[in-house]
Amino acid sequence: MSDIQIGLSKSARRTYALDDVALAPTRRTRDRRDVDTSWQIDAFKFDTPIVGAPMDSVMSPATAIALGKLGGLGVLNLEGLWTRYEDPQPLLDEITELPEADPASATTRMQQIYAEPIKPELITARLEEIRDSGVIVAGSLTPQNTQEHYETVVQAGADLFVIRGASVSAEHISTSHEPLNLKKFIYELDVPVMVGGVAGYTQAKHLMRTGAAGVLVGFGGGSAMTTRKGLGISAPMATAIADVAAARSDYLDESGGRYVHVIADGGLSRSGDLVKALALGADAVMIGAPLARASEAPGQGWYWGNEAHSRDFPRGVRTPLGVVGTLEEVLYGPSHHVDGTSNIVGALKRAMATCGYLDLKKFQKAEMTLVPEYRG
């Protein structure tokens, strides 16, 4: 892809967001009832490629269990309210009632709420609650807190471990502390690790070489994030997913057959976004906003991420999304909305069938078109 000159001393690469691309239907169509949306990472197989984002407004132990029983994977935020407070419900209620007209005071109060220390015994209790339900157990920590709490996570019986930050590299350099050695950490861990976010080919390939089972693709693209405004950094998702999918293919050859899963994470607000992410090369999608619209979601129709309460530099906001139905209706319908906010698995099956594909791996070969002028 050729560079575009910004000025005499600087050029830039043209990249594309999900809104800039669309799928092209093919000559052959399929019956959507024959479409298989299953996804498997390591020894764990799921009916759908839906991963619940580790955000307090999206995933509680109860919603992680519910999502697991509906065929997806719920990832619990192990630095959230459920591991800081014995009973977080009053605080969740308070966050949803903070004044929308005064975002500064709302952010200040959220920072105060999240200042409570993480309690290892609550990490254990929450993960054991999920495990006792019989679903696959997954928890998430940031790179900064992984070293301190990972043993608690593993001992509590996590099946999958997620290391999730705004941007994670295999070669973080710091003069103030000893950074997490991802390759050594993953090698010594008996649990499969998904790690991210990443935004490009080189960064992703380096993470794949650490032994990660999956790589999360995305940087500051979520609907509740203000990273682009605050830091001036952005990675349009269509290009990011395609680049990381290319890294996966090259690493497959380099490693002699080791397949690392690509999980699109961020900016996937409606069913069409999920469909395009999977067609661009993602194996699965980590979603927040679509699940935050479920009646069971702990945010009660409000959506916020971990960046919203950062002590040093908040890069997120509470966003009112409203409730569109139960979690089952959000995933499988029936849908009473025409905007892609419910029956998202049904939408995926219909799109795959329309484009002539019966499984997700082959769907990654779907033809795409560029429609940068279209916003409908």
Locate the predicted segments by residue.
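Alpha/beta catalytic cores of nucleotide-metabolism and tRNA/nucleoside-modifying enzymes
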Residues: 1-27, 96-97, 114-128, 232-264, ...
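Active-site entrance/lid segments in N-terminal catalytic domains of soluble metabolic enzymes
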Residues: 1-255, 261, 291
